[in-house]
Amino acid sequence: MSVITAAPLLALLREDDHTVKSYALHSINEVVDQLWSEVSNDITDIEALYEDSKFEDRKLAALVVSKIYYNLGEYESAVRYALAAEEYFDINEKSRYVETIVSQSIEMYIKLATENYGKEKSEIDLQLVSIFERMLNKCITAGEYKLALGIALESYRLDVVTNILTQQTSEPNMLKLITYVLIAATTTVSNTHFKINILYALFDILIRLKAPDYFAVSKIIVNLNDSKLAARLFDKLVSEKNTEIAYQIAFDLVTSASQGLLNELVATLSTGEGNDRLVEILSGLPTCDFYNTFLHANKRIDRSLLNKSKSSMDGKFSLFHTAVSVSNAFMHAGTTDDTFVRANLQWLGKAQNWAKFTATASLGIIHQGNLTGGKKIMEPYLPGSRASSRYIKGGSLYGLGLIYAGYGKEIIGYLKDQIVENSSNATDDDVDVLLHGASLGIGLAGMSSNSTEIFEALKEVLYADSANSGAAAALGIGLTMLGSGDETVAENLYTYAQETSHGEITKGLAIALALLNYGREELADETIKKMLEHENDSMRYGAVYTIALAYAGTSSNEAVKKLLHVAVSDSNDDVRRASVTALGFVLIRDYTTVPRIVELLSESHNPHVRCGTAFALGVACAGRGLQAAIDVLEPLTNDPVDFVRQAAMIALSMILIQQTEKTNVKVRDVNEQLRNVIANKHQEGLAKFGACVAQGIINAGGRNVTIQLENSEMGTLNTKSVIGLAMFTQFWYWFPLAHFLSLSFTPTTTIGVRSHDLKIPKFSFHCHTKEGIFDYPPMFEEDIDKSIEKVATAVLSTTAKAKARAKKSKKDKAVEPDKSKEEIKVENEQRDKKEHDADVPEEEFKIKYTSTYYKVENMTRVVPQQLKYIAFPKDERFTPVRKFKGSNGVIVLSDKTPDEPVEVIKTVRQEKETDAPLPAPFKVQDDLEF
């Protein structure tokens, strides 16, 4: 018979006899889930029994109290009493109560463990620890290793993680679990110190295995930025004669590791024997040479677009001249082709002052990566040459930095000498411009090198307190010390930002602090808080960029909340715009959510917020072709405010870079819109500037580069690309900084090189999809019927009406007398083509995997969307040393028949070394003063 009331049992609890009370508790425990509402009235009496140390069944009383609180929904109290029940609480019991308590216990433990991490004395209840560990053991016993590892990572229990991994009997299983932990550690673990400890532990486990996953080890090295670990890895690979994998990892490090790590690694390996080729690869010279060769050989530069822009935008106006200079630089980025500059010396001569500085620096983008001949190319414009203009001298030093960006070992000494020699005269106008270029140049060349020598040299320029050179010196320091978080440097920058009277320097220092805290996540919180609360607008502006860079790619909820709050509450428009822009950086890895988050902001009454929305979408979705982002941006291209239209057009070009008309139908419309804005005399200057720069971006690198923000093989952010974008967005204040976008350009190619000689063989691999989908968009052509339009406009309206009436009455299709047969034929062909294009269903352009394939030649254009359809047949002569998983860049190949002859592709450097001397660089005539 079921019990319908607990009253008799509750009455027994008031008896003096402990045996009777125990009986009552046992009975209540069996019915408490049904009668909890009645029993809860006497909860204080049951709690008193638990607190009575003389009562033998006090733990049972705790269990009953726990069940009452569970039914009341008071889970924290329920867990507390369940822990007090000790052995009476059976975690193996199959009930909703036990499942809930265990789940709540784990959550409580994780919360307490994360709060107490790093503290000497833990404040966690031992019973809570016991339940947590018993549940983990239960997972391990059941073979649920990933679940156990996930919980251990969330609770910062490194000991549990290492125990699970080291107790695996099978190395393949261990490697799978290590990969899981590595991905989780680099993407979800938010505590930097714990993340570092995990990665070091994983390195130690991996390096001791009989058959380690060396590529996983390289990922750990990049995340830790530790050259000593890298040296250990290469020593092991060389000692095992595993040179093919060593070369592949070296190429990977060149594109993903910091310059500081590479410099230290080269210095270490240079002392050993048999490391010459590794040292050469790690210098970055082969990679840059390969990319220059690809970009030069495959360039599809649409010069008619540039000429159209040049003729539509009067070079006498600095704004327009700068726009065409930047657009030209982007279109030719890395191709080493400066024919447009040579052919338009008279137009270049129109440049005045800082437009001349920008135009000279643009040569650095065109020759970017030319590490062997870069200085020789810029020589005619460098200080000490015949160039008379201070803007040419300063621009050439900036251009030198752009050529050697991230690989500046050979040029840093020269740039440092220029700074040291001139820093004492920083207040002189001529020297000020020169130091401005030199400071930006050395910052680029020494990016992330953490060089104290560069810092000390730039500090002298900064403290001279001259606006132009001081602001550039601040940025140079930030770039050099990128991501270091150096406390001494940070203190110097923050203190001087409050002392200087120059707004430009304050803003430069604020951005430098953001660069200093790149990737530091919660370690930057104190700096962010201090800057956000500052009364100076420039410091708050720097604060949101510090959030952007410190939390770049983390999708941190806290960071997003802070930015959204600033975006709607700050009193300064610049800060609000920057705050919305910063959302794009934080959400790089979660880019699909950005359109939804900023959609309402894109309709804000404040044009600066709308502008920030455009930049946020451009940053997060760069190179992705995301339709949702395009849908938000399209209305902004018709915004009534000119700078909003400017930002929208630039953002669209960043999103649609390397998209074809078949992979994204918007490409044609956007290109046409950009041309129309540039040609329209009634458009405001800022909108035309944006359209011209956007045209350069969408056609960048001879249509052979994209903006790639992640290193797919390493699972890390592409630091150069992220920093390039962050600095590019500063063009709002200073147009020369637009050149920084070139750091974000990644060549869209897969370059296979032979492992034994690093030469590029001519061979092909397979692409398993429909041929023609990824072809270059067609070149721009002037309308064929342009001349016909001129005739048509000359015809009187009365004549036209008479012809129309005559045509209607005859009801025939007679040819109009002012049009030839050839013209009619061309018009009909164009109309038929348009009708055919309109009839083509969208399904035809969907990219699908096919069992059939077409061949793609080595070192040719392979766009990001195409990579997943690329395959290297196993039975071919050349196969990758690492399993190909759809990544671009340099791939080391095994040659099955190395003794057989094969045709190889000569690189730009090899051509110059063997066939001809370096051509003499052209000089702009003195009478043009450029």
Swiss-Prot record:
Start-end of each PC repeat = 358-391, 395-428, 437-471, 472-506, 508-541, 542-577, 578-610, 612-646, 647-684, 690-722
Name one process (GO BP) from the record: proteasome-mediated ubiquitin-dependent protein catabolic process
Q: Which residue intervals make up region (Disordered)?
A: 806-840, 911-930
Question: What Pfam families does the record point to?
Answer: HEAT_2, PC_rep, RPN2_C, RPN2_N
Q: Does this entry carry the keyword Amino-acid biosynthesis?
A: no
State the family it belongs to: Belongs to the proteasome subunit S1 family.
Which protein are we looking at?
26S proteasome regulatory subunit RPN2
